[in-house]
A protein has these predicted regions:
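Charged DNA-binding/catalytic regions of mobile-element recombinases
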Residues: 1-201
Length: 201
């Protein structure tokens, strides 16, 4: 009705037999609060709660024999730290619940868990999240920007690791990602010294 404006709404009310002035209609229209841009609201939510937000997601990795493996991970928003990851051939809701149980054995400092509309995140998974004190928060459909921290980590993992090495199997992929996560946790000063030593050699 906002697109019609006061004159049109006034005309419709007259047709229905309501005798009100156009000025009264305009006055009440101005009182309707306008909702902000969805992107702005979501950004504000992420900024206000970043220390209490964790996100989980899947990404697929083909192996040397063209099998598809699914890598599940949980990432902390504030420090962009991987809290947990695991690899499987067939992810199921029960498997995801077990992964979350490994990460969140009890009440923790986190309040919100972001995840997309993957069918694996069903009622059992969201029920477990609620039981551990997490508020399950689904992102919009086809809106990867709403879980940008997780999507960025996947992109970095592909670019810096998986685009250069082909995983042989499930165990090999787990070992590769474990080494990559350990590398990311290495202090920057140590990484720089390693680079300098490599340049000297």
């Amino acid at each position: 009705m906002r697109t019609g404006g006061a004159p049109r709404i006034h005309g419709e009310l007259l047709k229905l037999g309501f005798d009100v002035s156009e000025r009264s209609v305009a006055r009440y229209l101005r009182r309707v609060p306008r909702r902000g841009d969805p992107a702005t609201r979501w950004s504000a939510f992420l900024a206000n709660h970043r220390e209490a937000i964790v996100a989980c997601d899947f990404f697929t990795v083909p192996t040397l024999t063209f099998q598809l493996l699914s890598c599940f991970f949980v990432i902390e928003h504030h420090r962009r730290k991987i809290l947990h990851f695991n690899v499987t051939r067939e992810p199921t809701p029960a498997w995801v619940v077990q992964q979350l149980r490994d990460v969140f054995p009890g009440d923790g400092p986190y309040r919100f868990m972001l995840f997309d509309h993957d069918s694996t995140f069903d009622g059992h998974v969201t029920g477990f999240m609620k039981a551990t004190g997490l508020d399950p928060t689904r992102t919009g459909i086809q809106a990867p920007w709403q879980n940008g921290i997780a999507e960025r980590w996947v992109r970095s993992c592909r670019r810096e690791l998986l685009d250069s090495i082909i995983a042989l199997n499930e165990r090999h992929l787990s070992r590769l990602i474990r080494a990559y996560v350990a590398y990311l946790l290495t202090p920057v000063s140590t990484k720089l010294s390693q680079l300098r030593c490599r340049d000297i050699l």
